[in-house]
Swiss-Prot record:
Membrane topology: Multi-pass membrane protein
NCBIfam families, sorted: PRK01821.1 (NF002494)
A GO cellular-component term linked to this record: plasma membrane
Compartment(s): Cell inner membrane
Keyword Mitochondrion in annotation: no
Naturally occurring in which organism (per UniProt): Pectobacterium carotovorum subsp. carotovorum (strain PC1)
Protein name: UPF0299 membrane protein PC1_1498
The keyword Zinc is annotated on this UniProt entry: no
Residues in the signal sequence: none
Amino acid sequence: MRNTFIVCWQYLRAFALIYLCLLAGNAVSALLPFTIPGSIIGMLVLFTLLASQILPAQWVKPGCHLLIRHMALLFVPIGVGVMNYYDLVSQQFGPIVVSCLISTFIVMLVVGFSTQIMQRERAMAGDRTPPKDNE
């Protein structure tokens, strides 16, 4: 029984923290003079809290694992909602496909170059050979 309460508390805490970051992102988004979705700002707030270790990752991990496990199910309402605009989507199908292909290619380039740079830096940091004297 006690274990059940602990697990429920962990899930409740995780979802509350994720939701508080979303609310903070929405509040910041409403104050900005330009448009950035509040959910994006909320994710950045959550990332900042986790990266600076202000918020322990263990506190949000149960909720994140549950959301990731059921992520495909969460996209069903979006897919159904897009079908309300089938005429518009079918008219703009070409530009949508082109933008998806171009953005995919750009992401692949950025990831490739970033990986090469990180591997190069890791190889230099891992090189523990003493410097050679030029005599």
